[in-house]
Amino acid sequence: MPKLKTHRGAAKRFKLTGSGKVRRHHANASHIMTTKTTKRKRNLRKSTILDKRDEKGIKRLIPYL
């Protein structure tokens, strides 16, 4: 069986936590920031845990991370 290749785009966007959960960054934080409140922009800077429904597919893309 051949080696599995890591999806490089996914590897740059997602990280695994110590407990095996997938960490991701928030969307909507790159431009058109003037209409967003300071509180909203501050919260968008933080990372969050990926939803369980999406976890299986992402873990398949990044098998060795």
UniProtKB/Swiss-Prot annotation:
Q: What processes in GO biological process is this protein linked to?
A: translation
One cellular component (GO) term of this entry = cytosolic large ribosomal subunit
GO molecular function annotations of the record? structural constituent of ribosome
Q: Which PROSITE patterns match?
A: RIBOSOMAL_L35
Q: Does the keyword Plastid apply?
A: no
Q: Pfam families, per this entry?
A: Ribosomal_L35p (PF01632)
| Xref: InterPro entries | Ribosomal_bL35, Ribosomal_bL35-like, Ribosomal_bL35_CS, Ribosomal_bL35_sf
Residue ranges for the region (Disordered) are 20-42
Keyword annotations of the record: Ribonucleoprotein, Ribosomal protein
Q: Which family does it belong to?
A: Belongs to the bacterial ribosomal protein bL35 family.
Q: Which PANTHER family match?
A: 54S RIBOSOMAL PROTEIN BL35M (PTHR33343), LARGE RIBOSOMAL SUBUNIT PROTEIN BL35M (PTHR33343:SF1)
HAMAP family cross-referenced by the UniProt entry: Ribosomal_bL35 (MF_00514)
What protein name applies here? Answer: Large ribosomal subunit protein bL35
Native species: Syntrophus aciditrophicus (strain SB)
User: Species lineage, top-down?
Assistant: Bacteria, Pseudomonadati, Thermodesulfobacteriota, Syntrophia, Syntrophales
Task: Report which gene this protein is encoded by.
Answer: rpmI
